[in-house]
Design a protein with these regions (language model features):
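A conserved regulatory-domain signal marking ACT and ACT-like small-molecule sensing domains
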Residues: 96-208
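Generic structural hydrophobic/aromatic packing signal, biased to beta-strands
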Residues: 21, 28-30, 43-45, 66-68, ...
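Internal anion-binding site segments
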Residues: 6-48
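Catalytic, metal-anchored helix/loop core of enzyme active sites in primary metabolism
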Residues: 35, 41-138
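A short linear-motif detector with a strong N-terminal bias
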Residues: 7-9, 22-24, 44-48, 55-57, ...
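Conserved active-site and cofactor/substrate-binding residues in soluble primary-metabolism enzymes
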Residues: 9-16, 63, 83, 87-94, ...
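Short, small-residue-biased leader/transition segments that mark boundaries at the very start
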Residues: 1-5
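Short secondary-structure transition/capping segments
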Residues: 13-16, 21-23, 75-83, 149-158, ...
Length: 208
């Protein structure tokens, strides 16, 4: 399923990433994204940088939210507790009642499938995202140009490139890309990861 569904947790998110996000006016949230496109359904779960003014950025602690964009309704959000003793107990009791009703009525569900069309699943490599990339590079003439060249040769357009910290021989840079297909981005990352002038690719995070 790896080439169809993107699944990534938050274990690689660091305090430095959170600090950079804050400087950019963003926060980092673990999002599940489902999108209907002409090429198929996008289905993925991963961390994303999201603008601090976006409604999802305010969802914290035991709360969860579902943010929807419709043709007529535009943007709307459903928000509530998704963890804790009482919310969990409420969900469990609701499931028990459903099971009992189904047994009494000799059925396996009171609402049938409402699907009316078959939709292909869009492959991960074809999904477009913006990316935040943080890396440690050699602090010498020509390194930034080489990095930019690798991105360009792999159809990755750079929106911003910032040099934030210098630590002796190495400098830390942050790159924000324009929207790009994941397969092109991964090709660029593979090449950069093998270059001697790149000490480390510290983080790659999608941007909402």
């Amino acid at each position: 399923l790896g080439d169809v569904y993107k699944r990534q947790g938050i274990t690689k998110i660091t305090a430095t990433d959170i600090e950079y996000a804050k400087e950019m006016g963003c926060t980092i949230k673990l999002l599940g994204v489902a999108k209907d496109t002409p090429e198929g359904i996008e289905a993925r779960v991963h961390p994303m940088l999201i603008d601090s003014n976006h409604p999802l950025a305010t969802v914290n602690d035991s709360y969860n939210a579902v943010f929807l964009t419709g043709d007529a309704v535009q943007d709307t959000m459903f928000y509530g507790r998704g963890a804790g003793e009482l919310p969990t107990a409420s969900a469990v009791v609701g499931d028990i009642f459903d099971v009992v009703r189904n047994i009494l009525w000799n059925c396996c569900g009171r609402i049938g499938c409402t699907c009316y069309r078959e939709c292909p699943i869009k492959r991960v490599g074809e999904i477009k995202s913006k990316y935040f990339v943080r890396m440690q590079i050699e602090n010498r003439y020509g390194t930034l140009a080489s990095v930019a060249s690798v991105f360009g040769n792999n159809k990755v357009s750079i929106a911003q490139m910032l040099q934030k910290r210098v630590n002796g021989k190495y400098a830390e840079i942050v790159v924000i890309t324009d929207e790009v297909k994941e397969r092109h981005f991964e090709d660029a990352m593979q090449i950069l990861g093998g270059m001697s002038m790149i000490q480390e690719i510290s983080s790659t995070i999608r941007v909402y």
